[in-house]
């Protein structure tokens, strides 16, 4: 039954995305938005004044960033009462007229972030107002990857781990070169401990998909990594998800995903 549901979802995604975007089209979209949207343009220009300090935490090199233009996001009140009082800035109806959306998957749009942490910062919100809950949209990540520039990485801040809009689901994306965890991954993996491996048969073209779960010891915080040679990594992720602690007052484990 689960395989039938997965097959139907994939068919829906194929139908919706017969004409997919390419990495070049996404870069052109960013360029056009920065040309016509003054707020995004000015805040991107301010990144030249960005201050970055290199330091070590538990022997791990860390970059600390000082970006005054991000003060609104980093100090945003995310308690239930505050969220209910403000209009959701990720809902299309509340976004400024200059902000445009690029249709990328069945449930997700792509937008330029007007308060970037680095140049080319993208926000990828759900088309419907639904809370941060990554299992709901995990199956669409693979299709999303295929439309982004090849040097981009997708990341996710959980509703209790830094998301400034926990009431509206969204991924984010930036160039991999700005993410120390990714640039340091090969070195970090040397301390990886295998936890589980899963094989799934996809179809006669793709064949068998292998996904492996690792625990990496030696990072500044607990770190799990999943490596997969196909799109079928979400089952292993959900098994990990089920083992992570969740507070009785919260709906998702405290996690960030890259």
Locations of the language-model features?
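Active-site microenvironments that recognize anionic phosphate/pyrophosphate groups
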Residues: 3-140, 152, 158-159, 176-258
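Short, well-ordered alpha-helical packing segments
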Residues: 142-145
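Active-site nucleotide-donor binding segment shared across nucleotidyl transfer reactions
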Residues: 148-166
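Phosphate-group recognition and catalysis centered on beta-loop-alpha active-site segments
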Residues: 173
């Amino acid at each position: 039954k689960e395989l039938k549901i997965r097959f139907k979802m994939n068919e829906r995604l194929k139908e919706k995305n017969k004409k997919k975007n390419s990495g070049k089209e996404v870069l052109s979209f960013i360029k056009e938005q920065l040309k016509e949207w003054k707020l995004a343009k000015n805040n991107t220009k301010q990144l030249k004044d960005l201050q970055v300090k290199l330091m070590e935490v538990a022997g791990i090199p860390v970059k600390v960033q000082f970006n005054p233009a991000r003060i609104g996001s980093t100090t945003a009140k995310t308690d239930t009462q505050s969220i209910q009082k403000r209009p959701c800035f990720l809902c299309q109806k509340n976004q400024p007229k200059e902000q445009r959306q690029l249709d990328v998957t069945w449930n997700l749009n792509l937008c330029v972030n007007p308060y970037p942490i680095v140049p080319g910062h993208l926000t990828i919100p759900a088309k419907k107002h639904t809370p941060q809950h990554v299992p709901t949209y995990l199956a669409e990540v693979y299709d999303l990857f295929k439309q982004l520039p090849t040097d981009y990485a997708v990341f996710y801040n959980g509703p209790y781990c830094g998301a400034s809009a926990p009431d509206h689901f969204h991924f984010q994306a930036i160039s991999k070169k700005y993410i120390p965890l990714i640039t340091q991954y090969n070195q970090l993996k040397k301390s990886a401990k295998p936890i589980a491996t899963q094989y799934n048969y996809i179809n006669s073209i793709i064949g068998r998909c292998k996904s492996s779960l690792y625990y990496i010891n030696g990072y500044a915080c607990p770190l799990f990594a999943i490596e997969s040679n196909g799109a079928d990594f979400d089952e292993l992720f959900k098994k990990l998800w089920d083992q992570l602690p969740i507070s009785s007052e919260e709906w998702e484990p405290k996690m960030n995903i890259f």
